[in-house]
């Protein structure tokens, strides 16, 4: 395993990990390289070209604004909503972006060149940055690819996209290898994952970082249920989380088990409404699927006996297990909607959440693997066809539906003994092959499916 749980679960801004978080990181990385090479003092102009899916749905996903902010030195992990909104307004008014926060160049969202019909060989989400000096002399140029979940690569680094590279004690590249490790050492999947994470940091640091991720998830939910009105983008999609919360809180003030599904739906809905509005979320493993893991973790904490006993321990074990399973999807297939459709985003997240819950419910490693397999098997073929290129319809409701699917998958797996006909590895390989066969119009281009069959009249608000 080369991918840390802290690469799969990262803090960023909405609405898209591949179209917002990744491009911001790429732009920032390009500026860091310019500074390192001593080119900033000579910089007079910047050109940005977007290709494929980034160009096709970038406007709805906030790609252009994310790139401008990244060029100014902003990072998705630390940028505040207030700073984002203020700087974008100033850039629009002045026509100037400050590269690295200091060098003014004429560049706005309208100056970014879009090439939706050109798909670069490495990945559908390609972007090229070109820095020019006096007399138009090219100082540097680099092409980056946003490969899903906020991961970015170049043609030279396509095999190492993680933010936390580290040699691990128990490497694996398949679910079978992970199960073999658990058998050999007589450990759970979360324990195996913890041994790998502690190769890079102490156990206390791992636990603290995972609990911080949970806290950010909860903060995201709380912000969302306090907000009303319409989501941005012109589709006039009304926020529902606050209304749902008020009604649920009145009907179920003591959190009775029969209302569990309603609360799970609410958490998923709240997270994805916050994501759709460009708020701070935990990528899990993508922004478009960011509501599933928090919703099922909410269930694990509030509606299981383990959660009643030690919610912090439940959080750590849940996220470690989910991360271990998520790394398999990243390594063996893809978590990018632009590459394999929504099955790679929502399907992967459902499998991760199902695995995490199965472990919390006392599942063996094989039952945990089975839970992930069930959730992914019944997500195969999901298309990514966001209406108007916005991460709203069908994305928000799909997270709630998939959170319920993950819980059901975990419960089904625990009714068995871990022996099952279809393996997780086979399902992951099938997902990759299905994504390769899927027509481009169903892979985050808004050129097919709901995106063209639902009439829209966009009025930007």
From Swiss-Prot:
Protein name: L-serine dehydratase
NCBIfam families: sda_mono
Coiled coil: none
Keyword Ribonucleoprotein recorded: no
One Gene Ontology cellular component annotation held by this UniProt entry: plasma membrane
Keyword vocabulary terms for this entry: 4Fe-4S, Gluconeogenesis, Iron, Iron-sulfur, Lyase, Metal-binding
Pathway: Carbohydrate biosynthesis; gluconeogenesis
Entries under InterPro entries matching the protein: ASB_dom_sf, Fe-S_L-Ser, Fe-S_L-Ser_mono, Ser_deHydtase-like_asu, Ser_deHydtase_bsu
Cofactor(s) demanded: [4Fe-4S] cluster
Family as reported in the entry's similarity comment: Belongs to the iron-sulfur dependent L-serine dehydratase family.
Alphabetized GO MF terms: 4 iron, 4 sulfur cluster binding; L-serine ammonia-lyase activity; metal ion binding
KW Metal-binding (keyword) present: yes
EC number in record: 4.3.1.17
Organism this protein belongs to: Mycobacterium tuberculosis (strain ATCC 25618 / H37Rv)
Catalytic activity: L-serine = pyruvate + NH4(+)
Pfam family, one: SDH_alpha
Cofactor: binding details: Binds 1 [4Fe-4S] cluster.
GO biological process annotation, one example: gluconeogenesis
Gene responsible for this protein: sdaA
